[in-house]
UniProtKB/Swiss-Prot annotation:
Changing K52Q: Still adopts a closed conformation upon binding of ATP and RNA, but lacks ATPase and RNA unwinding activities. Belongs to the DEAD box helicase family. DbpA subfamily. It comes from the Bacteria. It comes from Bacillus subtilis (strain 168). ATP binds at S46, Q47, T48, G49, S50, G51, K52, T53. ATPase activity is stimulated by interaction with RNA. Changing S182A: Slows down the catalytic cycle, but does not affect formation of a closed conformer and global conformation. One of its GO terms (molecular function) is ATP hydrolysis activity. Residues 214-374 form the Helicase C-terminal domain. A motif (Q motif) lies at residues 2-30. The gene is dbpA. This is ATP-dependent RNA helicase DbpA. Disruption phenotype: No visible effect at 37 or 16 degrees Celsius; no change in ribosome profiles. A quadruple disruption of all RNA helicases (cshA, cshB, deaD, yfmL) is not lethal at 37 degrees Celsius, although both 50S and 70S ribosomes are decreased, while growth stops at 16 degrees. It is found in: Cytoplasm. SMART domains: DEXDc, HELICc.
C-alpha cells in the first residue's frame, strides 16, 4: 500500500497530513508528488475532487525554504473562492513547518494585500488579474520565485484569463519549475504548455471517462413551467443530506432561493453578483452543514472542496459541456457515492446530446417521481426538514484545535523579527520550537501561532517576558 511516508517528505509535513486525516495518497498524488519533488515540469490531466491541491501543495511546502522571506511559489487560480481554498490547504499542510501562504484576488483591499506581501510569504495564491496588478505595481517580488502552478487551466481559458496568465509568465524567472493542472486539455492549453514549459512530463489520471464512476447520472424531461414542482418532488423523494442546485443565471438563483425559503427549506445561495465576504460566509456555512440546499451559478462549480455532497441537481442544464463535468464533480468526491439529476426541457435537448458525446456515455432517462412515491416519502422528508442538519467536521478542525494565535503590539518598527519570537518562546519551560507555528510580523503588530495546546501557558508567561529587551502587550488574537 502506498503511503506518504514513502516519499521524501519531512516529519513536519507528515505530521500535518496525519492531523488532516490524509492516510494514503490518491492516484494523482501518487503520480505528481514524486515528480514535483524532483522539480520536474508537469502537465497533469486530472478530474476535480481527485486530491490534486495536495498533490502540488505537499511538494511546494516541502521544497519551500522557511528562512527565505520572499515568495518562492506562485499558484494561479481562476476564482477567488478557489484561491482562498488553496491558501487554506497550503497553510494546513505547511502548519508545522511554519509555511506562510498569502491569497491575493480582486474585489478585496489591494493595500491590505500589499502589506501582507511585505511580510514573509513563502507561497502566493491568486487570481490572474490581481496577481498581474501586484507584479506591475512592484508589490509582488519575483526574484526568488522557483515554482509556478497553474490550477484549473481549462477554466482559466473559459473565463478569458489566458492572456493575463501569459503576461504573468513573461515576468517570471525563466529558471523555474512549472506545473499545469486541468480537467481537460484544449488546444490552447497544450500550446501554453509547449511555449512556457521545459520538456514537461504528462500525467493523466484516468477515471471512467470524464466523470467518475462514483456518480450516478440521470435526466428527467420537463416543461420549463413545471420545473419548480418537479424540484420539490425530487428533493422529497431523494431527501439528500447535502445538495447543490445549479441555475444558469443569478436572477434564477435569487428567485429559486426565495421560493425554497418560503417553503421552510434550509437553503442559501451563491452567485457572482454577491459581495466577496457573503460568498465566503455562505460556502463556510454550507461546509459546516448549517443548511442542506445551496442554490448556485457556476461560480460554485469549481474548486470548492466539500465532501459528502450527496446530490447535485442541474435545475438549468449547462449550455457548455465542460460545465456539466465540473458541476456534477461536486458530488462523488473522495471515494463517496453521489448522484446528479438534470432537468431537461425540449430547448435543452441539443445541449444534452453534446454533453453525452463529451462524457462518452448516454445519461439514463428516468421518470419524474410519482405522486404515490412522493406521498410515501413525505413523512421522512418532513422529519428531516425539522431536524437541524448535523454539523460537518472540517478536515482541518482536528489539526487546528490545539492552536492559539497570540497578538503582540510590536513588529518591524521595533526591529523585531520572527527569530526573536522563536528564541524567546522556545526558552519557556515545557515549550520548544516545535510548539511555534506561523509567525507574521507587521509594522506595529505581530501574530504568533502556538501549537499543541500550549497557547494558554505561553500567553501567561509572555505577559511578563520581554522580546528583544522590549516588553510587549500580548493577548489572544481575534483573527
Amino acid at each position: 500500500m502506498s503511503h506518504f511516508k514513502n516519499y521524501q517528505i519531512s516529519h513536519d509535513i507528515l505530521r500535518a497530513l496525519e492531523g488532516l486525516g490524509y492516510t494514503e495518497p490518491t492516484k494523482v498524488q501518487q503520480s505528481v508528488i514524486p515528480a514535483a519533488l524532483e522539480r520536474k515540469d508537469l502537465v497533469v490531466k486530472s478530474q476535480t475532487g481527485s486530491g490534486k491541491t495536495a498533490s502540488f501543495g505537499i511538494p511546494l511546502c516541502e521544497l519551500a525554504n522557511w528562512d527565505e522571506n520572499k515568495p518562492q511559489a506562485l499558484i494561479l487560480t481562476p476564482t477567488r473562492e478557489l484561491a482562498v481554498q488553496v491558501k487554506e490547504d497550503i497553510t494546513n499542510i505547511g502548519r508545522f513547518k511554519r509555511i506562510k501562504a498569502t491569497a491575493v484576488f480582486g474585489k478585496s483591499s489591494f493595500d491590505k494585500q500589499k502589506a501582507e506581501l511585505k511580510q514573509k510569504s513563502h507561497i502566493v495564491v491568486g487570481t490572474p488579474g490581481r496577481v498581474l496588478d501586484h507584479i506591475e505595481k512592484g508589490t509582488l517580488p519575483l526574484d526568488r520565485l522557483s515554482y509556478l502552478v497553474i490550477d484549473e487551466a481549462d477554466e482559466m481559458l473559459n473565463m478569458g484569463f489566458i492572456e493575463q496568465v501569459e503576461a504573468i509568465i513573461k515576468h517570471l524567472p525563466t529558471e523555474r519549475t512549472t506545473m499545469l493542472f486541468s480537467a481537460t486539455l484544449p488546444q490552447d492549453i497544450e500550446k501554453l504548455s509547449r511555449q512556457y514549459m521545459q520538456n514537461p512530463e504528462h500525467i493523466e489520471v484516468k477515471a471512467a471517462g470524464l466523470t467518475t464512476r462514483n456518480i450516478e447520472h440521470a435526466v428527467i424531461q420537463v416543461r420549463e413551467e413545471n420545473k419548480f414542482s418537479l424540484l420539490k418532488d425530487v428533493l422529497m423523494t431523494e431527501n439528500p443530506d447535502s445538495c447543490i442546485i445549479f441555475c444558469r443565471t443569478k436572477e434564477h438563483v435569487n428567485q429559486l432561493t426565495d421560493e425554497l425559503d418560503d417553503l421552510g427549506y434550509p437553503c442559501d445561495k451563491i452567485h457572482g453578483g454577491m459581495i466577496q465576504e457573503d460568498r465566503f460566509d455562505v460556502m463556510n456555512e454550507f461546509k459546516r452543514g448549517e443548511y442542506r440546499y445551496l442554490v448556485a451559478t457556476d461560480v460554485a462549480a469549481r474548486g470548492i472542496d466539500i465532501e459528502n455532497i450527496s446530490l447535485v441537481i442541474n435545475y438549468d442544464l449547462p449550455l457548455e459541456k465542460e460545465s456539466y463535468v465540473h458541476r456534477t464533480g461536486r458530488t462523488g468526491r473522495a471515494g463517496n457515492k453521489g448522484k446528479a439529476i438534470s432537468f431537461v426541457t425540449a430547448f435543452e435537448k441539443r445541449f444534452l446530446a453534446d454533453i453525452e458525446e463529451y462524457i462518452g456515455f448516454e445519461i439514463q432517462k428516468i421518470e419524474a417521481p410519482s405522486q404515490e412515491e412522493v406521498a410515501r416519502k413525505k413523512p421522512e422528508f418532513l422529519a428531516k426538514l425539522n431536524d437541524r442538519p448535523e454539523s460537518k467536521k472540517d478536515k482541518s478542525e482536528e489539526l487546528n484545535k490545539d492552536i492559539m494565535k497570540l497578538y503582540f503590539n510590536g513588529g518591524k518598527k521595533k526591529k523585531i523579527r520572527a527569530v526573536d519570537f522563536v528564541g524567546t518562546i522556545a526558552k519557556i519551560d515545557g515549550v520548544s520550537a516545535d510548539d511555534i507555528g506561523i509567525i507574521t510580523i507587521m509594522d506595529n503588530a505581530s501574530y504568533v501561532e502556538i501549537l499543541n495546546g500550549k497557547g494558554p501557558h505561553v500567553l501567561k508567561v509572555m505577559k511578563n517576558t520581554t522580546v528583544k529587551g522590549k516588553q510587549l502587550k500580548v493577548n489572544k488574537a481575534n483573527k
